[in-house]
Swiss-Prot record:
Primary location recorded for the protein, binned into one broad class: secreted
GO molecular function: ion channel regulator activity; toxin activity
GO cellular component: extracellular region
UniProt note: domains: The presence of a 'disulfide through disulfide knot' structurally defines this protein as a knottin.
Family, similarity comment: Belongs to the neurotoxin 25 family. ICK-8 subfamily.
Signal peptide: 1-19
Biological role stated in the UniProt entry: Ion channel inhibitor.
Keywords on record: Disulfide bond, Ion channel impairing toxin, Knottin, Secreted, Signal, Toxin
Organism listed in the record: Trittame loki
Identification of the protein by name: Toxin ICK-11
Length: 119
């Protein structure tokens, strides 16, 4: 499975290098990183307050449903949108950047899934 993720990331980066400008790539990567950083920050605030963290169930929300953490959203590339807090997959209107973003989301989701409990 890890080889598949690596292959997807390498292929997407190669395609993005030819199809998109460095500014577009930087903006898309920055947005994706900030989404996963917010998961860490939200979880850290709960722990800092000494509260018992809410039990988030992995893959308990479908695309378009309300969410709080990325790991709640079903789909390898699905993330919890920052502003509306709904599950989404689309990253960019540019198809190459969207593929790059979805690959990056899949990698980030493999890490953030540890914040959610399996059902």
């Amino acid at each position: 499975m890890m080889k598949l993720y690596s292959l997807v990331i390498i292929a997407t980066l190669a395609a993005a290098a030819f199809a998109a400008t460095s500014e577009e790539i930087s903006a898309a990567v920055g947005e994706i990183i900030s989404q996963h950083q917010e998961d860490l920050e939200r979880y850290a605030k709960v722990v800092e307050r000494g509260e018992e963290p809410k039990k988030y169930i992995r893959c308990s929300k479908q695309l378009g449903e309300s969410c709080y953490l990325n790991c709640e959203c079903c789909g390898a590339a699905a993330v919890c949108e920052d502003y509306k807090y709904i599950c989404k997959e689309k990253v960019s209107d540019n198809s190459v950047l969207n593929a790059l973003g979805q690959a990056w989301n899949a990698v980030g989701n493999s890490i953030s899934r540890y914040y959610c409990d399996a059902e």
